[in-house]
C-alpha cells in the first residue's frame, strides 16, 4: 500500500484554518475510490481537503470527464488543495477481505494520510469506513460535493497510471486500454493466457480462468 500526501502549510504546520467551503465551521475532506469493479489491480482511494481561497474550476465526477480533463484537474488539485492523500488496498487484501472491506480500508488509509486533520469526512456512496472523525455517506457525492469530485479524480488518475505501468509488464492483457475491467478483450486474454498475480482471484471471471488452466 502506497500513500501520497501534500504537506501541511504554515509555520511548522502548527495551525489549521477553519474552513467553511463545504460546511460552516467544519474542516471537510471528500473521499472517493476507483477500481471496485475491475478484475485486476488494486482499489485506490483519495481524500481531499479543498482550499476555499483557491477554487478549482471544472470539478466533477471523474467518470463524466475525459482523460485529458482528468489529468489537467489532477495537476490543479495537487497544487491548490489544502491537503490530499491517495492510498490503496492490494489485490491480496481484496481477495482476503472482499472488495467492499478492501475499499473501506483504502478510504480509511487515505483519510488517515491527510496532513490536515478534518472534522468531517464526506464519503461517496452509501457506506462509510470506520474513522476517528465523523463521516457522512452521500450517494452520487462525486457529482455533488466538490471535495468528493476532487477525490474521485485523484483516485481515478492514480489508478489508471498504475494500470498503464502494469501493462508494461503484462502487455498481453491490454491493461492500458481497459484498466483491468472485464471487457471482451480482457476476458479473451484471460482465457488465452490465464491470470497473472495482479488478477483478483475472488472475482468469478478470474476464478473461471484459473480453472481453465488447471
UniProtKB/Swiss-Prot annotation:
It catalyses: Endonucleolytic cleavage to 5'-phosphomonoester. Endonuclease that specifically degrades the RNA of RNA-DNA hybrids. Its EC number is 3.1.26.4. GO terms for biological process: DNA replication, removal of RNA primer; mismatch repair. Pfam families: RNase_HII. This is Ribonuclease HII. It comes from Burkholderia pseudomallei (strain K96243). The keyword Manganese applies. Belongs to the RNase HII family. A divalent metal cation binds at residues 32-33, 124. Manganese or magnesium. Binds 1 divalent metal ion per monomer in the absence of substrate. May bind a second metal ion after substrate binding.
